Each structure stands twice: as structure tokens, then as C-alpha cells.
A protein has these predicted regions:
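Loop/turn-to-beta-strand initiation segments
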Residues: 2, 94-99
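Conserved RecA-like P-loop NTPase ATPase core
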Residues: 5, 67, 101, 134
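Short, surface-exposed alpha-helical segments at coil->helix boundaries
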Residues: 18-22, 53-54, 108-111
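Short hydrophobic segments within beta-strands
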Residues: 6-8, 35-37, 99
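Structured adenosyl-cofactor binding patch, chiefly the S-adenosyl-L-methionine
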Residues: 108-152
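S-adenosyl-L-methionine/SAH cofactor-binding core of RNA-modifying enzymes
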Residues: 30-96
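N-terminal beta1-alpha1 ligand-phosphate binding loop
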Residues: 1-28
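Short glycine-rich anion-binding loops that position phosphate/pyrophosphate groups of nucleotides
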Residues: 11, 71-74, 102-105
Length: 153
């Protein structure tokens, strides 16, 4: 499986979040691509969210499954998340793209494209920290699917 993380904001390689994220990505057997885009500071409101949605979606293949991270999305356990990825694999999906929007959230264009709106809880997390949490959960899902003992119920 190929995993794409498409995010607004550029994370410096010297940032602790980047270093921690890399610890999980280096363990990942699946291919991983990160696409980062500059914030559109000149825009606001729906114009901003839709411009950012266009950027986030620009690097996503047409047939990819799209997961939009949003505080109002569906919450899944780690096993349920792994099961969702397995279902998509069994349906022939070879790419899953995760979208992390800007500070104002996602525009309707991104939400309409979503195969899953995913929430990691009702709290708002910093976008750079969310990348770490997502990387760990993708790695955890892979280990669950492989029967590796990393995940414990």
C-alpha cells in the first residue's frame, strides 16, 4: 500500500515532531510520501479553505482513498482503523491519502472528496503534532494487519 500525507504547513526537519514522526515512518513497510504546502495567508474564510483543499488534493491520485482529518469526523479504535485499511486493500485500493488542513479546517471540496472523515477525538491538536499521531497509528495499523505484537488490546 502507498500512503500519502498531504498537509498545510511545512515541518522543519529539525523540529521534534519531525524527528518523532520519522521514528514511525522508518518502521513502515508501506511506501510513504509527504506533500507539504504553504499556508495561503492572503485569503480568508471559505476562499482560504477551498484554496487549501485544492492544494491538498493536487497531489492525490484520482483513484486513491481519501481520508480527511477533521475534529467532527468518525472516531475509530486502532483495530477499526486497521480494518478500514484492510477493507480498502481487499477492494483493490493501492493508495490512501490523508489530508491535514490548515488552522481554519477543511473546505467543502476536500470534504466532498473524502472516503472517510476521521477524528482522533474531540480535542483540537496542533497540526504538526497530529502528523506524529497519524504516523504512529498508520504504523500501528500495519502491525495489526501483519499480526505483529506491537499493538496490545
Amino acid at each position: 500500500m502507498r500512503v500519502i500525507l498531504s498537509a498545510i504547513g511545512k515541518l522543519k526537519k529539525s523540529a521534534p515532531e519531525y524527528v518523532l514522526m520519522q521514528t514511525y515512518l522508518k518502521r513502515l513497510k508501506w511506501s510513504f510520501d509527504m506533500k507539504e504546502y504553504e499556508e495561503k495567508k492572503a485569503l480568508s474564510g471559505e476562499d482560504l479553505k477551498n484554496a487549501e483543499a485544492d492544494l491538498l488534493l493536487s497531489g492525490v491520485p484520482e483513484k486513491a482513498k481519501v481520508v480527511v482529518l477533521d475534529e467532527h469526523g468518525e472516531t475509530l479504535s486502532s483495530r477499526e482503523f486497521a480494518g478500514k485499511l484492510r477493507t480498502w486493500q481487499n477492494q483493490g485500493a493501492d493508495t490512501v491519502a490523508f489530508l491535514i488542513g490548515g488552522a481554519d479546517g477543511h473546505g467543502n471540496r476536500a470534504k466532498k472528496k473524502a472516503d472517510l472523515m476521521l477524528s482522533f477525538g474531540r480535542m483540537t491538536l496542533p497540526h504538526f503534532l497530529m502528523r506524529v499521531v497519524l504516523a504512529e497509528q498508520i504504523y500501528r495499523a500495519q502491525t495489526i494487519l501483519d499480526g505483529h505484537p506491537y499493538h496490545r488490546d
